[in-house]
């Protein structure tokens, strides 16, 4: 019991800064929306449309680079710290290549935006302008993620938290300058949010790089030999590990976007109620997602040390802590769901629907916690391909079709509307949780030599 208590303390010490960093990131998006809305409703809508395209594109790159964390954690655990700098250099090369692809996609996103049904031309132009300003921040964001993954792989999650809040503090005044045109800058409205956010990502990257350069604990792994050439072998391995994570993230983000599109014809009340419940459940998701990042670090580190039993302890402890958190947040959601809905909107019909959907959200929080922490465990074991197959099957083969059938058809029961899609979420997330646990159990039953051989690749 003592080993689990000790492991839980170490997991929480890693997870809490990640949670706070995510809060800062969410707050940046909130600030952009509010400040653009203060300029005009059209600018706020433009930022929202632009963000809906930016997120899938940049999260694909973000997911690809998540491969660095378990790689660095295992090198650190095995005492092969001299190899970390080379992995990080290749991470920067990979981030650079992916940045170019992301920038090309975002530059041409106008074709997608202008093809949207009945979109106002002025709104479309502002959304395109916002994305074309924001895309210059894509390299800064992805380079920052490489540096952050280096720190987190070395079990240092506080720097990412500090840089997150630094970014938030810089974002507010820079937004003000470019939205309203102060200090000789042009008045750009919502497009100014894109300029500000792009600048903030570069500030965060430079600040993180400065921290790494001066941190005594990383003195032995600093890059002292220049930037070096791309290493096709290392980059291929990072892509093999990272691509399934990137695709899983992409399919998860697009799933919720597709559901939002399917709900939109059902009416204003249904759309508003769905959006409130989804926004709140996304906030609750920060907790298990951050814990999953910590579990990846701990499992990877223990495997690097050559201890499959300690890796199992880290995995089980992460699941236990995650389930406890999910029970608490589920009780909180059920108890206060109407009060929470009232914080967003005071329309009685919207509040009633949002409260009903939040009840369903409370049901799936435990499954959601298990599946995301399970994903973190599998990342620690470098078993990322299974994450993609499980996520795709659970969300797109089971969750979305069943949600569609329940929400919009009479095949099983009378049409349930938005609640049907949320039942689909429950089916999809529960399926993912079960499959993740089965895969984890299968891996942990392998002989130690095979587990460690996979981890060392």
Curated annotation (Swiss-Prot):
BP-aspect Gene Ontology terms: sodium ion transport; xenobiotic transmembrane transport
Transmembrane parts of this sequence: 11-31, 53-73, 93-113, 127-147, 160-180, 188-208, 243-263, 276-296, 314-334, 350-370, 387-407, 418-438
CDD domains per UniProt: MATE_NorM_like
Membrane topology, from the record: Multi-pass membrane protein
Ranges of the Cytoplasmic topological domain: 1-10, 74-92, 148-159, 209-242, 297-313, 371-386, 439-457
Subcellular location: Cell inner membrane
Entry keywords, A to Z: Antiport, Cell inner membrane, Cell membrane, Ion transport, Membrane, Sodium, Sodium transport, Transmembrane, Transmembrane helix, Transport
Side of membrane Extracellular, spans: 32-52, 114-126, 181-187, 264-275, 335-349, 408-417
Disulfide bond annotation, renumbered to this chain: none
Keyword Disulfide bond set for record: no
GO molecular function, a single term: antiporter activity
GO cellular component, one term: plasma membrane
Listed InterPro entries: MATE_fam, MATE_MdtK, MdtK-like, Multidrug-R_MdtK
Role, per record: Multidrug efflux pump that functions probably as a Na(+)/drug antiporter.
Family assignment from sequence similarity: Belongs to the multi antimicrobial extrusion (MATE) (TC 2.A.66.1) family. MdtK subfamily.
Protein name, per record: Multidrug resistance protein MdtK
Organism: Salmonella typhi
